[in-house]
Amino acid sequence: MALHDIREVRIPIELDKPRTLLFDLNAFAELEDKFGSLDQAFQKMQAGSVKATRTLLWAGLLHEDEKLTERQVGAMISLTNVEKIMEQITQALTAALPEDTGTAENAVAPDPQ
C-alpha cells in the first residue's frame, strides 16, 4: 500500500454521541505501533479480540480528539453494540484502503508475441 493510496473516508458511528470513524495516516501509524501491522490488527479483531476492537476503534476516533484514551473508548463499547462496531470498523478500513489489485505472484506475464 502506498501512502498516496489511503482514502480519507468518514464513516458515521453512534457511540456515547454521534461520531465519525476515520482511518487516516495518523490512525494507521498508531495501529502499526500497537500491532506491528494493520493486517495483524484486523486479524486479531476478526478473531474476536476485544482489545484489538477497542484499539482499532480508538485509532479511528483520534482525528476527533487526540486526548481520547483507549479506556474511554472501551467505555463506549457494550455487548449489545460490539458486533455493529466491528462491522463499522471493517467498513471504514475497507473504504480507507486501496482495492487489492493482486500481487506479483498472481500477475500474468504479457504475451511476448
Where are these regions (language model features)?
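Short, isolated positions in well-ordered beta-strands
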Residues: 19-21
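Residue-level signal for threonine
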Residues: 24
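Charged interaction scaffolds used for protein-protein
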Residues: 1-10, 17, 29, 33-51, ...
